[in-house]
From Swiss-Prot:
GO terms for biological process: alpha-amino acid metabolic process; biosynthetic process. Residues 29-48 bind DNA. The modification N6-(pyridoxal phosphate)lysine is found at K286. Its cofactor is pyridoxal 5'-phosphate. Residues 1-69 form the HTH gntR-type domain. Keywords: Aminotransferase, DNA-binding, Pyridoxal phosphate, Transcription, Transcription regulation, Transferase. In the C-terminal section; belongs to the class-I pyridoxal-phosphate-dependent aminotransferase family. Gene3D superfamilies: Type I PLP-dependent aspartate aminotransferase-like (Major domain), Winged helix-like DNA-binding domain superfamily/Winged helix DNA-binding domain. This is Uncharacterized HTH-type transcriptional regulator YcxD. GO terms for molecular function: DNA binding; DNA-binding transcription factor activity; pyridoxal phosphate binding; transaminase activity. PANTHER family: HTH-TYPE TRANSCRIPTIONAL REGULATORY PROTEIN GABR. It comes from the Bacteria.
Amino acid sequence: MEKYMSLLTRIEEMMQSTSYQEGDRLPSIRQLSARYQVSKSTVIRALQELEKRHLIYSVPKSGYYIVKKSGKSKSGQPGPIDFATSAPDPDVFPYLDFQHCINKAIDTYKNDLFIYGTPKGLPSLIRVLRKLLATQQVFADERHIFITSGVQQALSLLCAMPFPNGKEKIAIEQPGYHLMVEQLETLGIPAIGVKRTEEGLDIAKVERLFQTESIKFFYTMPRFHNPLGCSLSERDKQELVRLAEAYDVYLVEDDYLGDLEENKKADPLYAYDLSSHVIYLKSFSKMMFPGLRVGAAVLPEALTDTFYAYKKLNDIDCSMISQAALEIYLKSGMYGRHKEKIRDSYKERSLRLHQAIRTHRQLGSGRFTFSSGQAPCMHTHLVLPQDLPASRVIHRLEKQGVLLEAIDRHYLSDYPKENLLKINISNVKTEDIERGVKLLMSHL
């Protein structure tokens, strides 16, 4: 990495510290040069780059100042506390870095980005993804990696296409990813719910299901489950893979937040798969921004031809500009730095939430079950007593400016719903979490 880029990153970290506010003046060029032991020309280049990214602005004969963000409340009144939205925080979107990558992609690939690509994806991006996946214990040949328009497209194709096992039903965790639930029910695909809790899965029940039902694949989120926020134990993962091989059931592993994992011993299901029964899905939308509709699917050899045929019918290619920009973003190291920033942000919010719940639960009856779960994670949940419906709590808190969302849409329509209150922290400012939790606890 060039010196000025290293310095740029350190200045950004300094700007994000609690001692600096928007509109504050940065240390002088001379002071920055002395502090970081670099030349003045390196400091100037780093500051100029930050200015290009609209993070700072210069005042002649005065210095550089931190840009004030637009969209702040001018009334000084606190806005709603949004524990409902699961999209990533817009304040941490890497807009400017990715804009640079888009411009660089156009300069590099020129006309190639504006003609039809290939259904499989941009070959240079696939090569970069193969290396990235290998760092996460997903060792795959390039011919098994497909670029899709997000995980949602991959799921749609997998639901539609026939599998080598000749089976028809799809098993899905309950509660589970709401858009997958919606897809199964809208398309009338036979689906069977599998209970998922903080403790994981009942492996004995999963085995009976695989034995007695015609299960095409089991869709699961082993890490950072949406909406529960918990992860499967390594033992459960190994047992799932064993059962998949024994009963010829495929596992569709949605690892949408795998980049948040801090435990180096926590591997994806794919790492345990020796019989080619795991389909691995990766997304960038929750780590970067929802509008980046680029995902990856890693498929066993037996599925690649069929997936390719269905993908080609579904669309000619995923956005070539987005693919090329993502390739540059990954190769440049920007994604690695952004990932650390996101991980730190969610970890701080998760820990603040867990601490606030423990501290303030006595404000109400305290009749709920809560596991502190994992940090960092966007999601967590409370198990409420049956005489306190989650819908009632949500309605009362909405009147006080605290937004929560019912969990019903995470269940199949014929599956018994539990009285759970899901909580997302991705769009709640750290300083608002305690106030929101106090209001929540007072209604429980």
